[in-house]
Amino acid sequence: STHCISSAASDVYKRQHSDHIDAAPELSRLVDAPVYLHPTDGFLWQRQNPGAHYRQLLDGATFTIAGTDLRVMSTPGHSPGSVVIYAEEAGELFSGDTLFQGGPGATGRSFSSFDTIIHSLQKSVLDLPAETVVRTGHGDHTTIGAEAPHLEEWIRRGF
């Protein structure tokens, strides 16, 4: 499906953990913009924000912000509904907590899974062009080319 979002004020949350979404309901109200969230994280959203609404952000969905086409890619692991947002023409991936510089995102939280995040990286992320810049949810940016060669090392170390 294609969504045209006329304002960058829409809130897109790539995973449902408090370090990223605590202010979402209030921000949504203040700027009159919807919150977008993968439905698999809906139970976590409702646990923290009872009765608060969100719009579904589904795997493969595309939308445009400020003239940039973006594609949603489901990458469970950090949370059940984690997604990354890929701006193919810009050569950028907004990875949230799915991929950091130096390894996969954290999986030590409730509802996280190391095996699942590794599968997500193999299935959706590490096959992107090597020059793709990865804008992470924490820390410095990196590239797919800098990270992909280390997959087996991450699997061996278990994080």
Q: Could you describe each region identified by the protein language model?
A:
Residues G51, S74, P80-F159:
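Metallo-beta-lactamase
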